[in-house]
Amino acid sequence: WGSDLAPGVAVLTAGVDVQGDRIEVQIVGWGRDEEAWVIDYRVLWGDPSGPRLWSDLDGVLNGTWGDLAVRAVAVDTGGHHTKMAYEFCRTRLARRVWAIKGRGGPGLPVWPRRPTRTNKGKIPLFIVGVDAVKDAVYARLKLTEPGPGAIHFPRRLDADYFRQLTAERVVTRFEKGRPLRSWQPKRDGERNEALDTFVYAHAALHGLISMGMRLNEEAEAFGGRGQALRLRSPEVIRSSWMK
C-alpha cells in the first residue's frame, strides 16, 4: 500500500530496540482480528547512554498518525543501556510505555499475567514469550490475502527491512531424546531489529488486550469514521548528540 491507510486500523503500538549507537522503533497499526499494517520505522542514531537520544525517541512516540496516537510501547531492556531504558519506562508508565525482556522457550505466553519487579529502577518488567510471537509472525507472512492476521507493508520499506524481518529460522535439536525448537539467526551476525521491533509491537498489543481492550470493538468504532490516515515518510534521525 502507499501513503493512505484504510480506516480499519484502530490501534497503534510500538516496539523499541536499543543498540550501542542507536535506537530503532517500529510502529504497527492493528485492525480486526489482528490484521496489521506497518506504519513507521525509525532509526535514531546517537548515544543511548545520555538523555538526548531518548528525547528523540519520546518525540517519535508522542507523534500522531491521522487521528491515532500510540497506545502502548514495549521497550526491550535485555540488551544495551538497560539502566537508561528502565528510567525511560519508569517515567512514562502512565502512557503505557512498558519495560520488557524477551524470553524464548515453549509454553511461554506472548504477554505475562503479571509483571516481575526489576531490581534496577524498581519498575514492572514484562517477560515476553518471543517464540510464540515469532511463530505467529512467520505464519502470517505467508498469508497472501487481506484479512485476519495479514500483515501489510508500505512500498517505501527497503530490502534491508525485509532481510531483517526474515533473518531467523527455527532450529530443532534433541536433548535426551526430546526435540527442542528455538529461533536462531540464519547467518552469524545477521541483523534482526525489524523482526524484534515488530515482535515487541505485537507484544504491546497483547499488553493492551490483557488490560481489557477489545480490538475488534475498537476496529468497528474507528472504521465508522470513514477516514484514511495520511502517513509520514520514514526518517533516519540523527540525534543532536551527533552534531
Describe each region flagged by the PLM.
Residues 1-6, 14, 25, 33-178, ...:
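Mg2+-dependent endonuclease catalytic cores in nucleic-acid-processing enzymes, primarily RNase H-like
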Residues 17, 73, 197:
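Hydrophobic, well-ordered secondary-structure elements that form the walls
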Residues 18-22:
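Short acidic, Gly/Ser-rich segments with clustered Asp/Glu that frequently serve as metal-coordination loops
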Residues 166-213:
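Extracellular low-complexity, Gly/Ser/Thr-rich intrinsically disordered linkers
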